[in-house]
Amino acid sequence: MKVVIASDSYKESLKAIEVCEAIERGFGAIFPKAEYVKIPIGDGGEGTVDSLVDATSGRIISFHVTGPLRESVQAFYGMSKDKKTAFIEMAAASGLQHVPAKKRNPLITTTKGTGELILHALDEGAEHIILGLGGSATNDGGAGMLSALGVRFINGKGEVIEPSGGTLHSIVSIDFSQMDSRLKHIKIEAACDVDNPLVGIRGASFVFGRQKGADEEMMKELDENLKHYAHILKQYLFCDVSKIPGAGAAGGMGAAVIAVLKGSLRRGIEIVLDYTNFDKHIEGADLIITGEGRIDEQTAYGKAPVGVAERAKLFHIPVIAIGGSVSPNYSAVHEKGIDAVFSITTSPTTLEEAYKVAEENIEMTAKNIAAVWKIASEKHF
């Protein structure tokens, strides 16, 4: 029996490899002689760099950058063994994990640290950058990142400002003359798991603002600011990013990648599956187990478990998903190829307590799934 375990991380709780190992322990308790293939995955957010570095025999480079609240934070990115491709998660520099829950405020947070990661990768000789969009604490349209790369945002008084979600409305002009010239000669791909536009009811502010600390009034303000930002970008670059699918990813970082860096957006899970030779690994598999921290209606729109299931169905392999939690409206994932969904949460609990017992609950859930699989296999229904 061959079981492929390809799970995403459980955000702010367990890395993808830790989830995969817990599933293997649980399944292994019932099927100790089975062949297990672990493929930690990501869809552009947390854990993506680890997956890509492992797949390319690369290395992790760590150093301090400007955090979302403009304080120094420890961040990292990955570099392939041949030093040609850099793997960057914007969450490593500009993610929610750097901002305590009580301090989350997308009006003041910045993506400047992500730009500093890109600069470092350029200094290391990167010719191709894969930038994972996801898990951000920001809503600045990528302007903070651009400022680190040399772009200057100027207000009505002629002053250069430090852009954030709350200051975009004050921009009256943009100076691109000092933008790092090396950016013109490299390939940039943004790994993106959503197709939300920059603005509007499905835009960055209204869909993702709340998890970053925004209330209703703040979301309206953020959306208006991004509309102004899009208008200014259009004046200079003749590119209207306001309605482009994916431009709203990661607080509008997608817009900056498309309009200014001339990069492309691609489903993050597709990038990861290609780099990990996923199709090769699943040949001959009897079962694939996938998962992520929360399985809900958003999972059906290009997130990691569905990306895994879509590939698996090409080979007619059944797929089971394990989630840290499962929302009542998760059923759309069945239409995308996931055959069964299980939650590791066994009783009402706080988020903090759920984090503490996540690993043992994953193992227990996997063991129970394996036990049912064993019964079904022996009965030959």
UniProtKB/Swiss-Prot annotation:
GO MF terms held by the record: ATP binding; glycerate kinase activity
EC identifiers of the protein: 2.7.1.31
Gene behind this protein: glxK
Organism: Bacillus cereus (strain ATCC 10987 / NRS 248)
Official protein name in the record: Glycerate kinase
Family: Belongs to the glycerate kinase type-1 family.
InterPro entries: Glyc_kinase_flavodox-like_fold, Glycerate_kinase, Glycerate_kinase_RE-like, Glycerate_kinase_sf
Keyword Nucleotide-binding in record: yes
Top class in the EC scheme: transferase
Transferase keyword on record: yes
Short name of one Pfam family: Gly_kinase
Alphabetical keyword list: ATP-binding, Kinase, Nucleotide-binding, Transferase
Transmembrane segments: none
SUPFAM superfamilies xref list: Glycerate kinase I
